[in-house]
Amino acid sequence: DNFIESVSAERLGKVVAKKIERLEKSSGRFSAINTLDDVFKIAGQTGDFEIAETYGVDEAMAGVLDRTSQLAIAAGIDAIRDAGLPLVERFRETKTGRKLANGWALPESVGRETGVIFASAFPGVDRLIDEVSRSSRVEALREVMGELEASGDTQLATQLKERLKGTNLESDYSFSRKFLFRILSMGHTQMAQHLGALGPNTQLNAACASGSQAISIATDWINAGRCKRVLVISADDVTYRQNLEWIGSGF
């Protein structure tokens, strides 16, 4: 399956709206990006991807994970399959003593010898941008509504309320109690929990060298006898939702 799509003109327009200045290599001068012709040409974006449906990750866990962690965990599951490591069905015991199926994991003997390293430059960024953007939009609307009501223009205020009906902006913003879990870099811990990997576990950020550094550390762990194998999961998605107009613009 192909999970890569082309970037729409609408999304590229948001990059233009950032009023970026770029360096012209031929003249050595800075010039403003004002049209779609001035933004990057070679670019793609990730398509639809549902980690719970495609990879069997618990839906509650998937709802907390940021996009980068979802991609990293999916890559980790694929790596386990490619390596031919066995997975056994897990069970949890209820209060009545019954055992219920609880997903698949590495055999305990294999899991104890398996470490996990999560390498990423922008973990949690999409969740952070989304939360701040929603809060800012609702706050801006509150100010506009307040000014309209104070001016006595009840007709325009009523029209605005009608247009907002059925949208996410209709109700007041409420801070998510899961905010910290969503923005923290937790791909390594969730991967270990999902697969039952009980060896050494960490995450790192070395920008574009994150994956290479992770493999180097994994080699050191194995040579030092800390584990027999290390699952290195590395991912970033700068094209996801609002990431592109911020991180993409930075590039």
What is each stretch, according to the model?
Residues 19-43, 99-102, 117-118, 128, ...:
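Nucleic-acid-interacting cores, centered on viral/eukaryotic replication and modification enzymes
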Residues 46, 116-118, 191, 251:
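Generic structural hydrophobic/aromatic packing signal, biased to beta-strands
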Residues 62-63, 86-91, 100-105, 123-251:
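Acyl-thioester C-C bond-transforming condensing/cleaving domain
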Residues 69-109, 115:
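Feature captures the FAD/FMN-dependent oxidoreductase FAD-binding
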